[in-house]
């Protein structure tokens, strides 16, 4: 594709009609640095869409006229950087193109107060209104499939996500982690204004935030006043330093696994922001649902794509059921059940095909536990109080450090009630029966007619939903996904999009 520079809104409309491709859009205000390069290269590597970079210094988002006048302009270098790193086209409009005079169709938007009244919004009145206005205008002109933004401006990212939802815009927001320079400070177009001494001061500010992150991981409290005192001792002017919930921007709660520590300082005439995410453990995805809803298949793929541990809790109950049958244990007699729980060892191990095998006392039972014989008894065994207490404790041990996706029937309600993302995966009984019928790993199901399979699934649903301990129910904060008519890949992509929307990319950086 021929690389082009577009300067007029009419040209952007003609170009969009002629490219015969979806668009990845990377909006910038110019003076591009390695952070922008990361955005452009990420867009290029994500898919085969056409990549469009815009360069437009938006006056509406400047609350300080001097700041606008001093904003660095390096247009020739920006063009070179954009094209050499994957841009197919560059849009460089004038103010009149974006905000044509006497055009009543231009909407000047207000940012939501619940997100814009804290942090930067306290002192930069109207800033986020200007951001919303220009991005909304650009999105309507360009109509991209994906919008690429950096997490450095986290508050702005939240506000633009809200804008997309509020205006029902058909665009997916893709974010990348804050990119830092050699001395730890976040890359910013304004860094060119810093003297050597000012840069040292900002580096100290960033290092204090990163140190707070380490302290938090050690399960220690963050002392904001102490950090502010340290900064003040260095003659650093602190505009704000807040510990907040990462999505609501309200005060962080003790039970929040992921929280935001954000600050703004001034060095000379330059104002800079920085933040870190504080995390007690890595994120957890909890996937619940009835038998045959596709939980195992979907969860395995999600674990692989997100590099998370796959915890098949249902397999643990099946493994115990297998041992009870094998040893002819009368599980209704408490003492005999306690003996088998005391001696059992259930663990998972990757095999040569990169799949996960289930072991009971060092014996691989991956295939055996999927038999109809096990299916007919596992619900009864899993409803026993002692069994659930034992296996839930084992599952929580595995999940102490997070970094996993677990599937079962009580993951989001009982095992991991504070999971960052809870999914309730389900499907119609007809659909689930068909899946069981044609499951290559279940020979027993292949030999049973569809009607009988439906009746067995109904029976299992009733038992799971009506057991006294940890019944199968949808967690209050779970997102229900009905999988009828969707491919496995579509369901997996949907859940990964939800995960990416909730979990900052920066939390993946150790």
From Swiss-Prot:
Keyword Glycoprotein (UniProt): no
InterPro entries: Cytidylate_kin (IPR003136), Cytidylate_kinase_dom (IPR011994), P-loop_NTPase (IPR027417), Pantoate_ligase (IPR003721), Pantoate_ligase/cytidylate_kin (IPR024894), Pantoate_ligase_C (IPR042176), Rossmann-like_a/b/a_fold (IPR014729)
A GO MF term: CMP kinase activity
Keywords: ATP-binding, Cytoplasm, Kinase, Ligase, Multifunctional enzyme, Nucleotide-binding, Pantothenate biosynthesis, Transferase
Binding site for beta-alanine: 61
GO cellular component, one term: cytosol
Catalytic activity line of the entry: (R)-pantoate + beta-alanine + ATP = (R)-pantothenate + AMP + diphosphate + H(+); CMP + ATP = CDP + ADP; dCMP + ATP = dCDP + ADP
Positions annotated to bind ATP: 29-36, 150-153, 187-190
EC number: 6.3.2.1, 2.7.4.25
PANTHER family given in the database record: CYTIDYLATE KINASE (PTHR21299:SF2), CYTIDYLATE KINASE/PANTOATE-BETA-ALANINE LIGASE (PTHR21299)
Name of the featured protein: Bifunctional pantoate ligase/cytidylate kinase
Originating organism: Prochlorococcus marinus (strain MIT 9301)
């Amino acid at each position: 594709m021929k690389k082009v520079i577009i300067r007029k809104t009419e040209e952007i409309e003609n170009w969009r009609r002629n490219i015969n491709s979806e668009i990845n859009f990377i909006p910038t205000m110019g003076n591009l640095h390695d952070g922008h390069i990361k955005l452009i290269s990420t867009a290029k590597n994500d898919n085969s869409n056409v990549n469009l970079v815009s360069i437009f210094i938006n006056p509406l988002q400047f609350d300080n006229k001097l700041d606008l006048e001093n904003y660095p302009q390096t247009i020739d270098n920006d063009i070179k950087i954009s094209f050499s790193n994957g841009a197919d086209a560059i849009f460089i409009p004038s103010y009149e193109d974006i905000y044509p005079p006497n055009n009543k169709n231009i909407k000047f938007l207000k940012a939501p107060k619940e997100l814009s009244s804290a942090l930067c919004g306290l002192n930069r009145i109207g800033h986020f209104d200007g951001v919303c206005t220009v991005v909304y205008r650009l999105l309507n002109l360009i109509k991209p499939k994906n919008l690429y933004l950096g997490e450095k401006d986290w508050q702005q990212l939240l506000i633009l996500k809200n804008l997309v939802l509020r205006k029902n815009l058909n665009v997916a927001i893709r974010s990348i982690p804050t990119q830092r320079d050699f001395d730890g400070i976040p890359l910013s177009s304004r860094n060119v204004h810093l003297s050597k001494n000012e840069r040292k001061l900002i580096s100290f500010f960033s290092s204090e935030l990163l140190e707070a992150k380490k302290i938090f991981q050690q399960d220690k409290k963050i002392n904001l006043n102490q950090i502010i005192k340290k900064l003040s001792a260095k003659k650093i002017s602190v505009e704000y330093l807040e510990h907040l919930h990462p999505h609501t921007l309200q005060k962080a709660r003790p039970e929040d696994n992921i929280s935001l520590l954000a600050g703004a300082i001034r060095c000379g005439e330059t104002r800079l922001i920085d933040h870190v995410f504080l995390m007690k453990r890595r994120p957890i995805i909890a996937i619940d649902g009835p038998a045959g809803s596709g939980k195992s298949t979907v969860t395995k793929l999600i674990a692989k794509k997100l590099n998370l541990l796959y915890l098949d809790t249902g397999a643990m109950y099946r493994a115990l059921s297998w041992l009870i049958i094998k040893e002819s244990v009368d599980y209704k007699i408490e003492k005999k059940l306690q003996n088998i729980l005391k001696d059992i060892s259930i663990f998972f191990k990757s095999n040569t095909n990169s799949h996960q095998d289930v072991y009971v006392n060092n014996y691989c039972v991956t295939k055996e536990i999927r038999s109809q014989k096990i299916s007919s008894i596992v619900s009864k065994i899993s409803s026993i109080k002692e069994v659930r207490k034992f296996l839930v404790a084992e599952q929580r041990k595995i999940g102490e450090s997070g970094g996993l996706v677990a599937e079962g029937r009580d993951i989001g309600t009982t095992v991991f009630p504070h999971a960052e993302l809870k999914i309730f995966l389900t499907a119609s009984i007809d659909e689930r029966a068909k899946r069981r019928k044609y499951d290559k790993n279940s020979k027993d199901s292949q030999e049973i007619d569809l009607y009988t399979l439906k009746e067995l699934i109904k029976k299992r649903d009733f038992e799971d939903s009506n057991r006294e301990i940890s019944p199968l129910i949808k967690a209050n904060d779970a997102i229900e996904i009905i999988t009828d008519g969707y491919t496995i890949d579509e369901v997996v992509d949907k859940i990964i999009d939800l995960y990416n929307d909730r979990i900052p990319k920066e939390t993946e950086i150790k």
